[in-house]
Structure formats: C-alpha cells, structure tokens
Amino acid sequence: FGHQIMADTFGGKAEKSQIANVVGARQFDFQGKLNDVYVWHRDQVTGVPPGAQITATAGYCAVGALSYDFPAASVQFHPEYTELHLRKMFELASGYFLTTEDVNAAIASFKNVEIDGKLFAAEAADFFRLHS
C-alpha cells in the first residue's frame, strides 16, 4: 500500500478500484516504453498529489507510478515479486482473498510476458545514487 499511502499523505487520493482484485502480470506504459510487471492490488491512486507527476499508466490504472518534486517515487505494481513468489501466495490466498477464478486468470496472465526484475533494481539504485 506504499503507493496509495504516499499519494494520500501528500495530498492525492487513493480508493478501491472500480474493478475487483488485479493480480498476475499486466503491461504498464512508462512514458512510451511498455513493460510487463507483477501486480496484486485492489486499491489504487485516483488523484495525483500536488507536485507529483505520473510516470507510468496501465489500461485499468491511470496512476501506475509517481515521481514527486522531492526525493521520492512510488509504484502501483510490485517489482519485488517473482512469478514463483506470486504462485505461492496464490496457493495461500485461494479461497480466502482470491477466488479460484482470480487465481486461474492470474496464472494465465503469466503466459507470453517478459518481466525484467533487474530493470527496476537498476532504477532504484540510480534513484538512491542521485539522492544520497
């Protein structure tokens, strides 16, 4: 919930998504560059805080990532997740937080995607180098 909490704290708005749980792999547009990422959320940012800029969007999520006018950034997706990690979480959540249909759709979303976890690690490292 970091992305949503940051937006809300700094004057934006976060609320439950119009759609149900969004889990699995989705494509985000990073200012013209498309990347597949792992997602698991229901809440999302719906109002951009003053001084923040949208740096990524998705078809179902207008505020997929934010860059602030101070040393901070936040993302709707989960660069720390791996497919294996999500599959294990799906096993635990099935029947509690997720329906069988949610789990099946999420697993199906992993087909034909290429997720580069190192890309976001490099971006995070660059961010900290720039602001340390």
Model-derived regions: residue spans:
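Cysteine-nucleophile active-site neighborhood
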Residues: F1-F30, L34-D36
